[in-house]
Amino acid sequence: MPSVPSDEEFLTYNRGVIDEFRANHGVVTQPPFPVLLLTTTGARTGRRTTVPLGFAVDDDGRVYVVASKAGGPKHPAWFHNLRANESVTVELGAGSFEARAVVTTGEERDRLYRRVAGDDNAYAKNTDRVFPVIVLDGVPTPASGMHISQPQKTG
């Protein structure tokens, strides 16, 4: 099973990805899959915070992310933030979009999760929690090849 990075390791890694993303109009060398930047408003602090996330696109062209935190025992902070305030900013490629974060449930959540995780997701083996799947309503469908169509790793 993969190990779960510490919060400090996540922060250090994420800072590098964010800087590279913005310097190269949405193109990064690591991780080895396309990412978007999600900016949420802190539930307690009100401060805007940005994280890089892998993403997928469903059959209807909706962009979505999974709150896996590498299989950590708790949901990532960005997920708690968007539950308190569903208004988010998404940077995708060279564009920036205001969006509404919609937490999926039931069959829709399961279907979208299976689409990216498959039947044997290593992150899921690290924890008993169910990974939330969030549709980013208002983000246009990215260009072909700019999204993940196989199992992914998200923050």
What are these regions (language model features)?
Residues 1-30, 143, 155:
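Extreme N-terminal tail/first-helix region
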Residues 1-12, 40-47, 87-96, 142:
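N-terminal short leaders/motifs
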Residues 2, 122-155:
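C-terminal edge-of-domain segments
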Residues 13, 30, 46-47, 70, ...:
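Generic, well-ordered alpha-helical segments
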Residues 25-26, 45, 121-124:
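Short helix-to-loop capping/linker segments positioned immediately adjacent to catalytic or ligand/cofactor-binding
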Residues 29-32, 130:
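A short, polar/charged loop/turn motif at coil->beta-strand junctions and beta-hairpin connectors
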Residues 32-68:
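Short beta-strand segments
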Residues 68-132, 138-139:
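Short, structured beta-strand-loop surface elements
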